[in-house]
């Protein structure tokens, strides 16, 4: 069984036991998080939400919070001596999906 959930402005396909990375939730490690914005539940009997499936939830356990690898944003205007260098590390939360309740 799998489901498609919405979190952090993104849609993520999840299965029980899967590790996923989502936008930072601001939750302590080892806490349980419940997602109620379930768009789709697949398996033996398929349920499609309009926009969300009624009564469907996905529970996940928080493993850790961290920051992704650094990316470099470099702006340059040719022949004008304009250069700007900026780095960014996106915060994330690592989860392990425990159950899909449909």
Curated annotation (Swiss-Prot):
Record carries keyword Ribosomal protein: yes
A molecular function annotated in GO for this UniProt entry is: rRNA binding
Its cellular-component GO annotations read: cytoplasm; ribonucleoprotein complex; ribosome
Known Pfam families for this protein? Ribosomal_L21p (PF00829)
Per the UniProt entry, what are the Gene Ontology biological process annotations, in alphabetical order? translation
Keywords, A to Z? Ribonucleoprotein, Ribosomal protein, RNA-binding, rRNA-binding
SUPFAM superfamilies assigned: L21p-like
What NCBIfam families does the record point to? L21 (TIGR00061)
Q: Which family does it belong to?
A: Belongs to the bacterial ribosomal protein bL21 family.
What is the documented function of this protein?
Answer: This protein binds to 23S rRNA in the presence of protein L20.
Give the PANTHER family listed for this entry.
50S RIBOSOMAL PROTEIN L21, LARGE RIBOSOMAL SUBUNIT PROTEIN BL21M
Query: How is this protein organized at the quaternary level?
Result: Part of the 50S ribosomal subunit. Contacts protein L20.
Protein name (database record): Large ribosomal subunit protein bL21
Origin organism is Lysinibacillus sphaericus (strain C3-41)
Gene that produces this protein:
rplU
């Amino acid at each position: 069984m799998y489901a498609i959930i919405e979190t952090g402005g993104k849609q993520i396909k999840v299965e029980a036991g899967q590790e996923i990375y989502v936008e930072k939730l601001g939750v302590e490690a080892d806490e349980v998080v419940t997602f109620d914005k379930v768009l789709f539940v697949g398996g033996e009997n398929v349920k499609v939400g309009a926009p969300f499936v009624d009564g469907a939830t996905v529970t996940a356990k928080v493993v850790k919070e961290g920051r992704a690898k650094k990316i470099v944003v470099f702006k340059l205007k040719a022949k004008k001596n304009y250069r700007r260098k900026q780095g960014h590390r996106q915060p994330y939360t690592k989860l392990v999906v425990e159950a899909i309740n449909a």
